[in-house]
């Protein structure tokens, strides 16, 4: 596989996705980066991109609506007694898929949210003392309501850290919203993707091949140093209580390599690092109350960090 192959595949994905998704170029690109990096995504805002991506990949897709009464066994599965045989057998839960859409994940209590932890980190589930390996690729795309909504349970830090990206999906601008209305006026149905004529672009084996290629994308020592210095700056920032961890810096490295490959390059540039850092940091750093009172948010503070740290030449 060559850099141009990865880039061409991404362009085909984007072209097919455009049949369904209007705008949202960056959220879709971040979803593809997460898939090829082996990460998970937390979406805040309008959903819809995850189902489209799954349709383009020829992989299994499952959606779970998280609610306050959802139990861990509703996600992982449970043993069921078969009257005819007199034996228990495993009834697998919806986690046994390849792309899992966890809709409104912060509607469910922490115990249920944490049921995904092992699956997200280890790509396996332990049920009744038996280990069950999940099919590859396995990716969780979770949507959440903003924390000010009633009936929400904030995701615990351990759960947040499992997500490679937190992607903010904004409301559409005027031109994009007009295009959406035109499509619906002419009979568009977002719930019938087959009728739209979406063509699968990637197979599971192709995803695996792309991941192997991405591992060999070149990262110069200066780029590694840049990633480390940005992380260190977050820990020393007067606006931040909890800075980026080494794990976050590792995620920046891996995501930057994937983003470079999508651009048709076999090497990482500082701009690649700058592109992937905000969605990796925004759910990991904790701002001081004074910074929030000033009206700053995580993205503004991360933007400051990236502007302050010298870029390698």
Q: In which residue ranges do the predicted regions lie?
A:
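Pre-Walker A (pre-P-loop) alpha-helix and adjacent loop at the N terminus of AAA/AAA+ ATPase modules
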Residues: 3-46
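Walker A/P-loop
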Residues: 32-67
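Short beta-strand-centered segment that lines the nucleotide-binding/catalytic pocket of NTP-utilizing
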Residues: 44, 59-73, 128-136
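Walker B catalytic acidic pair
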Residues: 45, 103-104, 115
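P-loop (Walker A) phosphate-binding loop of NTP-binding proteins
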Residues: 46, 75, 143
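Canonical AAA+ ATPase core
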Residues: 82-87, 108, 112, 120-216, ...
